[in-house]
């Protein structure tokens, strides 16, 4: 089953706490262009559905960033969970090598 997630580029200077209040989860994409990383935001409801269907470091996810015209295969590298609330706090994606 192929999972597809659409993200947005995180606005410059935006505060993570404000993003979470607005219903977004901060995220990063690593390895898409060498050592460069991109700060992203993902809708919190999309993240909840993703975490029910995907396993960390095992499930391949199609990530789409329309603002950058980038689409590629990634894996869910890390999920940080809020210790008191038990909700996703931050997620990291790792681009897989094109093969």
Swiss-Prot record:
UniProt GO MF annotations: 5S rRNA binding; structural constituent of ribosome
Name of protein: Large ribosomal subunit protein bL25
InterPro entries tied to this protein: Rbsml_bL25/Gln-tRNA_synth_N, Ribosomal_bL25/Gln-tRNA_synth, Ribosomal_bL25_short, Ribosomal_L25_dom
Function: This is one of the proteins that binds to the 5S RNA in the ribosome where it forms part of the central protuberance.
Quaternary organization: Part of the 50S ribosomal subunit; part of the 5S rRNA/L5/L18/L25 subcomplex. Contacts the 5S rRNA. Binds to the 5S rRNA independently of L5 and L18.
Family stated for the protein in its record: Belongs to the bacterial ribosomal protein bL25 family.
The organism's place on the tree of life at top rank: Bacteria
Keyword 4Fe-4S assigned: no
Disulphide bond pairs: none
Record-level GO BP terms: translation
Keywords tagged on the record: Ribonucleoprotein, Ribosomal protein, RNA-binding, rRNA-binding
Pfam families: Ribosomal_L25p
Gene name of the record: rplY
Protein species of origin: Nostoc sp. (strain PCC 7120 / SAG 25.82 / UTEX 2576)
Cross-referenced NCBIfam families: PRK05943.1 (NF004612)
GO CC terms: ribonucleoprotein complex; ribosome
